Amino acid sequence: MNAKKEARLRRARRARAKIREQGVSRLSVNRTPRHIYAQIISPDGGQVLASASTLDKSLREGSTGNSDAAAKVGALIAERAKEAGITEVAFDRAGFKYHGRVKALADAAREGGLEF
């Protein structure tokens, strides 16, 4: 594993430890060069309560690796969280910089009604 990925995973571990202490559901984001994924995970970490990604049938058309697609995923995860009765989450960016696609997803989720 290269140093850049190790540093990202180290940041992610620290953030997840702090989120675990808070005892709230977390909005976990994972990004690849082609897709972006979002999951709302229960406070104990044992269950996925809602999920959305650019692989969903409704979002698959068009480009999937840009900020516009990430914003659509953010809006969709906020909608699915409301259906599951979740309004407050902790944002887990998995060590990725809060910039670009990660920021677009977070902003869209906030606009959709999620608080973090």
From Swiss-Prot:
InterPro entries: Ribosomal_uL18_bac-type, Ribosomal_uL18_bac/euk. Pfam families: Ribosomal_L18p. The keyword Ribonucleoprotein applies. Signal peptide: none annotated. The keyword Ribosomal protein applies. Part of the 50S ribosomal subunit; part of the 5S rRNA/L5/L18/L25 subcomplex. Contacts the 5S and 23S rRNAs. Belongs to the universal ribosomal protein uL18 family. This is Large ribosomal subunit protein uL18. It comes from Chromohalobacter salexigens (strain ATCC BAA-138 / DSM 3043 / CIP 106854 / NCIMB 13768 / 1H11).
